[in-house]
């Protein structure tokens, strides 16, 4: 069942340690880091907000150099404070299974009620997320739900709902990560003429959705629920096709 009927509760508040640093994960295809400027902008915003410093110049060139010559890999860049600006930077390349990108299989969601969202920054300290994933168990994706009943995000992706061909996603209110691919999905929706809204979504909206989509930097777009509405199915296909075009052949 793509969306499990069960709900779990996780009582611990999100309290990661920002001193461990922040990071970005980029998809590299044919030597090109996808959405590099957006990833760097988000990383730079977090470094300024958390540590009061700027990223050193030339990081974009360093990422491009690291990606050069690689057909399909994952690139991770970390910024770690160490007492004096600028932060320590690390760039790492790792193999990536092609099946990870735009996978055709549906994933299963399990709703987990939490006290708070994880917040605006992509922190290296993922212990809170790790505990939630352990609670949910293997083979499922925990979908975080606020005490108010509003949908937040999964532990690794932003969430979109399609109903009647109309796209909706939770707003950027400081409780969820401002996803890079989330922004790309909204841009593609506008370009393709797919109505898209950023607004509070609840479990009722989740139950009524024709299609549930998850957006992330490596998978790009995953489906967690697909029902019979033709308009929503077509919209999901068009969005996936647009993201595939971003990656290239």
What are these regions (language model features)?
Residues 1-74, 78-249:
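Helix-start/capping segments and mature chain N-termini
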